[in-house]
Amino acid sequence: MNELYKRYDSITEEQNQKIEQVRNCYISSPNLDRILADIHRCRKISQRGGYPDCMLVMGEPGAGKTTLRAEYLRLNPIREESERSVINVFSSDFPEQSVPRQAAICFLQDLGHELSPKGLLAPELTRILANLMIHCGVEISLLDEFQHLIETESYKVLKGAAKWLKILINKSGLPVVLFGMPYSKIILECDDDDTLAGRFMIQRTIEPFRIIPLCQHSCRLS
């Protein structure tokens, strides 16, 4: 066994901690700071009444959507009270190839709902979800992998997904931030009266983080 292989078996606790810090660090940028501020704006402005302001954050795999969501969660942790957990910022992922009913069940489970959804259809599950979000003190929802809800060639299915999303926002009265692939925004075109697109006026794109060699950076400045 060569020395390069064995060196990873003798990593010290201090080295492990440093590796963990590097792997979990959040690297800020003007664009990411702006998106974080936009998310917070949607949350706070929506508390002033009227229709909630929602937001769509798009980016290719590895661009940093999940990391950005984790940073906002870090800034707004769950608070434990005597009779409930206060989840001001609710975070979840759309399951793969999901339909509204599956998505509602997934979100209910992530909020700690323990009752069986057997026999319940999407409208009833959505009503329960909206009520539970309000009970848990949710002020904004960050929902990742949004493309899983629209990965279909059926326009009818897309219209159904758009309608469900609008119903969830209306029943809860809470803003939603959707994270997904760039093509995810097609769902905003599948709403019959275009009101869904009006809810998601704020749309941002995250570009992949790139490291520019110092020599190239110097050339750009010269």
Briefly describe each language-model feature range.
Residues M1-P52:
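A short, basic N-terminal segment
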Residues R74-S85, H113:
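Post-Walker A helix-loop "phosphate-sensing" segment adjacent to the P-loop in P-loop NTPases
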